[in-house]
């Protein structure tokens, strides 16, 4: 009997990607985050679609329409909070996924890695524009502050900002276009994710040792399908605990006040998942310098393959690099904390030290540690 799974033009693609895919036998739970990100994206598209059915992208009614969703639409409150907290879960999975890539040297798959960095940028842009849509105080002022950063670009900056705003301030035109982009970008992200997967399957997955696993492969189904289902259940459990018990834990109370251009909130800050970059931005007392540091804090990921000086791919057998990796993780947590604090002593100096440490670790200390480890092993 001819196996339809292996011969049908469409089924064949699914089969080669999720069923008969040869996978390393030793990949750990850190390899679960790819599938979890896919689940997050599908969840965000579905909840977002239902929210868009009731939302109005107009400055006069946007805030009221979100209130209407929560009060009057059947299960509107759960859809709204699943979407808001789903974004937080999305970024937790993203950071874990990128961290895994850094730790195990997955960035040596150049095409996969570079598309991943583009995906990270696209997701951050989508999340930023989504945060503007409820049109609360933090939505409005967040949009004003972040878009204003582009005015630091020499010569064209001011014109560029006014072009993005569609006027001389964040107003109706800005909200409408942000809604349009926020709606379309997740589909672009989905397409890019498929390309990401396509390039990954050209090389096959990396594994914790960083050594070729060609000699020991197992089929993706049933082994990793069941493992991914466990991961998905845990993801949904954590998400629903957030949604049902403390839906506003990660939000800002200021966003329950309708946007008012005449009243600036005392502390303007983005959502928690941007705080590390926001802290780096604020730690440089120069507009253009801060913006460059902000962009480079993410763009530095593209340089990772060039900064890899070790003769080994993974950090599994490199204790000095492991130590520096976890210092980097702690540094990012410190930056996240500082990004949410007011600009005053001692937070300013802590933020500046943490920012210097961030770039120093990635650009100097980790490559140096790799070279030391090579010499210790007489390689």
Swiss-Prot record:
Cofactor note: Binds 2 heme b groups non-covalently.
Cofactor names: heme b
InterPro entries tied to this protein: Cyt_b/b6_C, Cyt_b/b6_C_sf, Cyt_b/b6_N, Cytb/b6-like_sf, Cytochrome_b, Cytochrome_b_C_euk/bac, Cytochrome_b_N_euk/bac, Di-haem_cyt_TM
Binding site for a ubiquinone: 201
Pfam families in alphabetical order: Cytochrom_B_C (PF00032), Cytochrome_B (PF00033)
UniProt keyword annotation of Transmembrane present: yes
Gene Ontology molecular function, alphabetical: metal ion binding; ubiquinol-cytochrome-c reductase activity
Example GO BP: mitochondrial electron transport, ubiquinol to cytochrome c
The organism's place on the tree of life at top rank: Eukaryota
Cell compartments where the protein resides: Mitochondrion inner membrane
Binding site for heme b b562: 83, 182
Entry keywords, A to Z: Electron transport, Heme, Iron, Membrane, Metal-binding, Mitochondrion, Mitochondrion inner membrane, Respiratory chain, Transmembrane, Transmembrane helix, Transport, Ubiquinone
Free-text function comment from the UniProt entry: Component of the ubiquinol-cytochrome c reductase complex (complex III or cytochrome b-c1 complex) that is part of the mitochondrial respiratory chain. The b-c1 complex mediates electron transfer from ubiquinol to cytochrome c. Contributes to the generation of a proton gradient across the mitochondrial membrane that is then used for ATP synthesis.
Family listed: Belongs to the cytochrome b family.
Note: Heme 1 (or BL or b562) is low-potential and absorbs at about 562 nm, and heme 2 (or BH or b566) is high-potential and absorbs at about 566 nm.
PANTHER family in UniProt: CYTOCHROME B
Name assigned to this protein: Cytochrome b
Organism (species): Gazella gazella (Mountain gazelle)
Gene this chain is encoded by: MT-CYB
């Amino acid at each position: 009997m001819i196996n339809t799974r292996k011969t049908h033009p469409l089924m064949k693609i699914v089969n080669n990607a999720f069923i008969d895919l040869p996978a390393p036998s030793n990949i750990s739970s850190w390899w679960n985050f790819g599938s979890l990100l896919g689940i997050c994206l599908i969840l965000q598209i579905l909840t977002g679609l239902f929210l868009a059915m009731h939302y109005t992208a107009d400055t006069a009614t946007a805030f009221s329409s979100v209130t209407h969703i929560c009060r009057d639409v059947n299960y509107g409150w759960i859809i709204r909070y699943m979407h808001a907290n789903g974004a937080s879960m999305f970024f937790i999975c993203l950071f874990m996924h990128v961290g895994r890539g850094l730790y195990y040297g997955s960035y040596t798959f150049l095409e996969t890695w570079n598309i991943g960095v583009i995906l990270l940028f696209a997701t951050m842009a989508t999340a930023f524009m989504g945060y503007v849509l409820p049109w609360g105080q933090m939505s409005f002022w967040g949009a004003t502050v972040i878009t204003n950063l582009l005015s630091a670009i020499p010569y064209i900056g001011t014109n560029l900002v006014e072009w993005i705003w569609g006027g001389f301030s964040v107003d109706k035109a800005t909200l409408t276009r942000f809604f349009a982009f926020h709606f379309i970008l997740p589909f672009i992200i989905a397409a890019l994710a498929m390309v990401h997967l396509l390039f990954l399957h050209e090389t096959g997955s990396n594994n914790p040792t960083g050594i070729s696993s060609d000699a020991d492969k197992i089929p993706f189904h049933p082994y990793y399908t069941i493992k991914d289902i466990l991961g998905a259940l845990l993801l949904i459990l954590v998400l629903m605990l957030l949604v049902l018990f403390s839906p506003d834990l990660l939000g800002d109370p200021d966003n329950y006040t309708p946007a008012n251009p005449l009243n600036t909130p005392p502390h303007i800050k983005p959502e928690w998942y941007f705080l590390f970059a926001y802290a780096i931005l604020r730690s440089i007392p120069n507009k253009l310098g801060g913006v460059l540091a902000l962009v480079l804090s993410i763009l530095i990921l593209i340089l990772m393959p060039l900064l890899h000086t070790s003769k080994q791919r993974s950090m599994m057998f490199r204790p000095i690099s492991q130590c520096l990796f976890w210092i980097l993780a702690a540094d990012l947590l410190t930056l996240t904390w500082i990004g949410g604090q007011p600009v005053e002593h001692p937070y300013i100096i802590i933020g500046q030290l943490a920012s210097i440490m961030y770039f120093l670790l990635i650009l100097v200390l980790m490559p140096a540690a790799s070279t030391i480890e090579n010499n210790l092993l007489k390689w």
